[in-house]
Amino acid sequence: MPAKGADLSAHRETADVVVVGGGVIGLSVAWRAAQQGQQVVLADPQPGLGATHAAAGMLTPIAEAAYAEREIFGLGQDSLRRYPDFVAELQAATGLPTGFRQAGTLQVAYDSDDLAVLTETRVLQESFGVHLQQLTARECRAAEPMLDPSVRAGLLAPADGSVDPRLLAAALLRAAEQAGAHLVRQSVTEIRSAAGRADGVRLADDSVVHARWIVLAAGWQSAAIAGLPTGIAPPVRPVKGQIIRLRTTATTDADGVPPGLLQRTVRGIVRGSSVYLVPRDSGELVVGATQEELGADMTVTAGGVWELLRDARTLVPGITELEIADIVAGLRPGTPDNAPVIGPCELPGLVFATGHFRAGVLLAPVTADTVAAYLRTGTPDPGWRPFAATRFGVRGVSPPGSPGPEVAERAAAGMQVEEAATAWR
């Protein structure tokens, strides 16, 4: 390998691992793999500027609990437990902030119909073994005084948290490079194979990097890269999300309390529509997010922004005084059952770490730890079973007991029930 930080694009190089994609998943995998002594090449023309850049950074497996997603809930809980140590290690290694907060999530309902949906949400969460604190309208406003008086009731998930994905990505990139990973600011145009095994990638400038392992973490574009044999490509698609960042011009008060309207993440149902507001210590408030099946469209629309601001203002009228700092659209990598695709496939040397949909930031620690362990040992973790590519009929490699395609079909059917019953999107 060349010296740390060298430009690999002009060379034909060899590495232990090539990570394709520099979002929060790819960055985390690259960091963990480099930490265990492997020579890592991370390929992405703009690391951290895909779905990660547009993410709110909610760490809310409990509040996100949904029908047909029990396995994702368990994986999310596992990853949330890892987060404090994950960010502490990251910040110690780099000296960079991540915006990590663990102040909880308050789920609220605006009217009687929304309250019925919130009740259904509570029943679902209890079926997962989670019992949240039920709050009256008065208790909701005591917890968050800036809530509108019309809020009817709430559920408090005290262990939930949030992180700033943009800060997290910057810290992960520095940590990965400090651990020895080499960043190539180019896209991967082809997965190369030889003798029945993935053995490298071709970059946009036509140079080649050979590697023992290729980790496909390219988000919604994972299935579009050339060179994937028939039946191997993971079934990911782009799902558009628009998100708004607001900020206050106020400064920290005399007691050192940061500015802001909210103390914790608030997720609301407003006349059947869902909205979330995620506060940052800086005083920034993130409002999101739409969910639109429009292919690779990344247009910010007046309608999408209006709906988000309308619902957010209904819950927290004070947002009208905030400055608009940023409005962006991103593309989440969705799968037919909303769950990620993690693990090896029938093409030896190729490992999936994609399709994390709404939960990429949340699932980064557990995905990175699990994939890095596989890169070290070559043995699939049984915990991957619900997320094996074989559940879609893709020619993956399944740990014993992995689900088949019929599981994904049942899950996809369950999504329709979830959308009608919970509306927490």
Residue ranges and their predicted role:
Residues 18-20, 209-221, 368:
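Short hydrophobic core segments
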Residues 31-35, 45, 57-58, 96-101, ...:
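Active-site substrate-recognition segment that forms the wall
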Residues 58-139, 143, 311:
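Dinucleotide-binding Rossmann-like beta1-alpha1 core, especially the glycine-rich loop
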